[in-house]
Amino acid sequence: MAQHTFLVEIGTAELPPKALRSLAEAFADNLKSELTKADLAFGDVEWFASPRRLALKVSELAGEQPSKSVEKRGPAVAQAFDAEGKPTKAAEGWARGNGITVEQAERLVTDKGEWLVHTAKVEGRPAKDLLGELVSQALAKLPIPKMMRWGDKTIQFVRPVFTVTLLLDGELVPAHILGIDSARTLRGHRFMGESEFTIDNASQYPQILQERGMVIADFMARKVKIKADAEAAAAAFGGVADLDDALLEEVTALVEWPVVLTANFEEKFLAVPAEALVHTMKGDQKYFPVYDKNGKLLPKFIFVTNIESKDPSQIISGNEKVVRPRLSDAEFFFKTDLKQTLASRLPRLETVLFQQQLGTVKAKVERIETVAGFIAERIGADVAQAKRAGLLSKCDLMTNMVGEFTDTQGVMGMHYARHDGEDEAVAVALNEQYMPRFAGDALPSGLVACAVALADKFDTLAGIFGIGMLPKGDKDPFALRRAAIGALRIMTEKQLDLDLVELVEEAVRVYGDKLTNKTVVTDVVDFMLGRFRAAYQDEGIGADVVLAVLARRPTRPLDFDRRVKAVSHFRSLDAALALAAANKRVSNILAKVEGELPTAVKPELLVDAAEKALATQVAELQAELAPLFAAGDYQAALTRLAALREPVDTFFNEVMVMADDEALKANRLALLNNLRNLFLQVADISLLQ
């Protein structure tokens, strides 16, 4: 069967840059799905995306659907013929509908009876007759949160559509999509190249667009070019460009013909904290800051323009003029803020609401102060510094800088605290209290910062859960999931041996009588343990491993982490699944015992060699493993317990647990109970699969 190249390009008004890549990828995925459902074989599907187009190029596309044999069952033979053997009206109607006579029908015999049947060959439809509808379906399923209408049309799409191109090799595929008839027209760059031109063959895409329209349609090609050119531009003056990937993606989505240029700003602005300048350059202007080899911000920036100019100096000058007022604002805010200390801003936090039922931000920082001190005592941090940092933690919200540039909260608090002469650990904690801000982000560096970060997160968790506002589905306005995962990461990765129950109880205590949920402590702890499960599964650790540990409900995250890693290692041992099955068997046996389970094994009641051997090993391991359990060395303990595989297998092969003799039965149940309790010191390994 001949294979073809299919092109679809949707020419639009400027598409939202932050959604461009996801739209193109979803378009490709959707078309693959539609082609598969239509039974049209295909090879690769390449996606292209620029500010004014979404395009797909399908290689090795089948020219038509494969022909199929379809069995069409008719009436049962008993109903197909009357008493004289003549076809009934039902049989004749069915045959006529299938283009045959009753005599031409075949017979299908099953164990339920005999039916008339006709095997029809259904010819596959040509791809060109299907592609228009398949593209329409793929576009209709794009994840577009907000649609637009344009002109006098009722049609909706993410942005107005101006051209639709569908080519199967060199043949134009007739279609009417989003109110536009398909044509060979492509639109080039707004200001360079040919504004409009026609394409003869799908194989010419995207090269023809680049050569005649001066548009690089390949998103990844533009991104690679911008990155390489920006790195080279920075290296030319000994600098290193801050090529933040999220910003790089956004800039890639803003241009069709990227040209990288370098500009400057006045050195006097370097007196302002670099974070504020960087926020202005990256967040507002989409510029790439440049640092020297030591990480110090340079008075330069790199930007990407969408045009090749005969006089780039004009574009450079224009961008310098645009950024200067923004940097001047930052300088003004910084100098003004320095006229007041952070501590002097504390009373004004009374005017900012944290949550209606939970009170103001001032009340929140007072709670953070107390809980941070509580945590500091337990992790060996300076209590006075932790409490001071907790009290000042939100004061920078009342500064001009943070009021204008909200993303600088925390980091500006650090700079202002340093200016005020606060201890360095306090200043650093003001910045690091929000860490980790996202998955994979850095953690607070020092113990004081850890105490404040944890106190802030537990205050939010206890408060919001305490008034019954649990996160539901995707709705999590107070970022409780992020707070829980962040707190767990701090405790495990910074090796802080804290108990969740103790921390939540303290966070609840300082709220006084504001909280109405009587089960808030249990709710928060369960919620956090649930976040643990999701986090480990993201790391590739099996759900059964985490469930085995969760069954024991250890509430010290550091201890929980050690157990998970130990069980994960144990699961890789040859003996693991056999011992897991044995534990499940033991669990089932013990579950049927009424009353209290026996624990004392009487040596004189050990009759069979197999139970004597198992009892000896269990007793020896109880003594040997006690210090390992106490030290939290669960991996070593489980590795030793793996040696029980053979004696356990032999025991179940040779010993009847539920003996007629009640004394023997009780003794054997005690032995199994002791065996199971050894494993339960770590996890319920009967849940391993």
Swiss-Prot record:
This is Glycine--tRNA ligase beta subunit. The lineage of its organism: Bacteria, Pseudomonadati, Pseudomonadota, Gammaproteobacteria, Aeromonadales. Its EC number is 6.1.1.14. Pfam families: DALR_1, tRNA_synt_2f. Belongs to the class-II aminoacyl-tRNA synthetase family. InterPro entries: DALR_anticod-bd, Gly-tRNA-synth_bsu, Gly-tRNA-synth_heterodimer. GO terms for cellular component: cytosol. It catalyses: tRNA(Gly) + glycine + ATP = glycyl-tRNA(Gly) + AMP + diphosphate. It comes from the Bacteria. SUPFAM superfamilies: HD-domain/PDEase-like (SSF109604). GO terms for biological process: arginyl-tRNA aminoacylation; glycyl-tRNA aminoacylation. It is an enzyme of class 6 (ligase). It is found in: Cytoplasm. Tetramer of two alpha and two beta subunits. GO terms for molecular function: arginine-tRNA ligase activity; ATP binding; glycine-tRNA ligase activity. Keywords: Aminoacyl-tRNA synthetase, ATP-binding, Cytoplasm, Ligase, Nucleotide-binding, Protein biosynthesis.
